[in-house]
Amino acid sequence: MSTEAEPRVLREVVLSQLATGESRAYKMWLPPLTDPTPVNELVERDYQRRPLRFGLGIMDEPRRHRQEVWGVDVSAAGGNIAVGGAPQTGKSTFLQTLVVSAAATHTPRQVQFYCVDLGGGGLMYLEDLPHVGGVATRAEPDRVNRVVAEVKAVLRAREQVFKQYRVGSIASYREMRDDPNNPASQDPFGDVFLVIDGWPAFVAEFPDLEPAVQDIAGQGLAYGVHVIITTPRWTELKSRVRDYLGTKIEFRLGDVNETQIDRITREIPANRPGRAVSLEKHHLMMGVPRLDGVHSADNIVEAISSAVQQIADRHTDQAPQVRVLPERIYLHQLDPNPPGPDSDYRTRWQVPLGVRESDLTVAYNQMHLTPHLLIFGAPKSGKTRIAHAVAQAICKRNSPQQVRFMLADYRSGLLDAVPQSHLLDAGAINRNSATLEEAIKALAVNLKKRLPPPDLTTAQLRARSWWSGPDVVLLVDDWHMVTAAAGMVSPMAPLGPLLPAAADIGLHVIVTCQMSMAHRATMDKFVGAAYGAGSPTLFLSGEKNDFPSRDIIVKKRPPGQAFLVGPDGKEVIQAAYVDPPEEEVFSPPSEGS
């Protein structure tokens, strides 16, 4: 049998030799953007990687015949991001990818994320990342408020630090934080990101927070505070916010004519989540938030959990966590060491009201300046408990020689609110209109004697030296019951002319009232005079229609939570609480006793 090779034509020989060569023809057409790239490969392939640049996907540049990692540099003007796209186009997954990419390339000291998840709950899977300070959902309205308040507090604190240390730019501040010998190194916050997934729902459910987000978006970049927002329609994102979001990413829109980038977005294929267009007007395939090298969104929840664990294992530090208002704050927790009767008048009449939502510090009523307090709320909202706590705080600060109380307590809700020693000697407790009317007349006669004569000096007015005796607190629980039981003339009428001089004559008025009667109460000559004078007012839980106002937020709230309106502004607080007598809980005896 012959072993000679069969003869081949020249063409076959040439093709065989060319096929084995190392050099290949230039590929003009690259594969289509179909499969997403995992974050670990985005990080490895990102040749532009630098601090505060996050690799987020693959960008197709057909004119240059290139497909390279596309990312966002948040250190400059593009540090605020708007993401538009119809439902199920990949917006929430993009946010997950952004956070995981940032966490994979930065420490929890460098970047922190505070998230409001009003979408499909995808951001909840990132909660255990050390870079994430908190995630709030629509089922946690108080936590949503706190997330925004926390980020705004960072912005305000940065403004003060920049002013104090004459910092010229956020770039300089980042360098200062990296220097352990610089006071700025004590700042636990780096670049802070407020992430809101679902802007239309946010505006609809939290309209009072929109101005705060606008402030953060408009002012934050200069101080290293960023905003990232997703929306299904660009028209939902009003220009007052949209114009501050320098980076825009567009997934497939429900109406392609709404594009904010270019008509090229019409070419984004349907039913292809993750496909988008950037401001460079190139097509993108966004990555997926996984570190296992898998080019797929399958089993993404397990992949995210694994990625979160991998990143958490690398770090020992943690982003500052979102603090929330307590459901109940007791007076003794709020005011553990009250100043005593030996303190000066101003200190004794600085009375704690509750904890501020904005920064969780104590909110005070400066009763030496604004001597009254009004409390409006629906039944079971905590009106009487707050009045009880305020009365108790006043009594702890003042001796019986310094303050005395008169009560209008038709429901006996103020039992034990004021010690016997701090009650007026006569007419102190009034449970019906007959006794109250007589007591108020007598009180008015005595207080008129304290009106300042016309020839007093400023120093004498400040010292209140023309009269002596205790301040008087008129505590009225359930104002609506008092007015309903009265005739044509209010029992408080004799005190009405004295209210403008209340601070001079030592008169303080504390009133609780049903929220449904609040608007009518503020029209009353007595309560209305106190309200019109700018007295601190607590609006507890209620219906919006109970007190129609553009400036005052009345809505359903947990017991004790109130919208405080006062001379220093408006804010949400959790008011101080004391147990009523029937709820007092005694500690069990210790073992062996």
Swiss-Prot record:
A Pfam family reported for this protein in Swiss-Prot or TrEMBL: FtsK_SpoIIIE
Q: Which GO terms describe its cellular component?
A: cytoplasm
Q: Which GO terms describe its molecular function?
A: ATP binding; ATP hydrolysis activity; DNA binding
Alphabetically sorted, this entry's keywords are: ATP-binding, Cytoplasm, Nucleotide-binding, Repeat, Transport
Binding-site residues, ATP: 85-92, 377-384
Positions of the FtsK domain: 66-260, 350-546
Quote the disruption phenotype from the UniProt entry: Increases efficiency of DNA conjugation when disrupted in donor strain. Loss of secretion of EsxA and EsxB, but not their expression.
The places in or outside the cell where this protein is found are: Cytoplasm
Q: What does this protein do?
A: Part of the ESX-1 / type VII specialized secretion system (T7SS), which exports several proteins including EsxA and EsxB. Plays a role in DNA conjugation, in both donor and recipient strains.
Q: Which NCBIfam families match?
A: T7SS_EccC_b
Q: How does it assemble?
A: Part of the ESX-1 / type VII secretion system (T7SS), which is composed of cytosolic and membrane components. The ESX-1 membrane complex is composed of EccB1, EccCa1, EccCb1, EccD1 and EccE1.
Recite the other comments.
DNA conjugation in M.smegmatis is unidirectional with distinct donor and recipient strains; mc(2)155 is a donor strain while MKD8 is a recipient strain. Mutations in a donor strain that alter DNA transfer do not always alter DNA transfer in a recipient strain.
Q: Would you tell me the protein name for this molecule?
A: ESX-1 secretion system protein EccCb1
Origin species, per record, is Mycolicibacterium smegmatis (strain ATCC 700084 / mc(2)155)
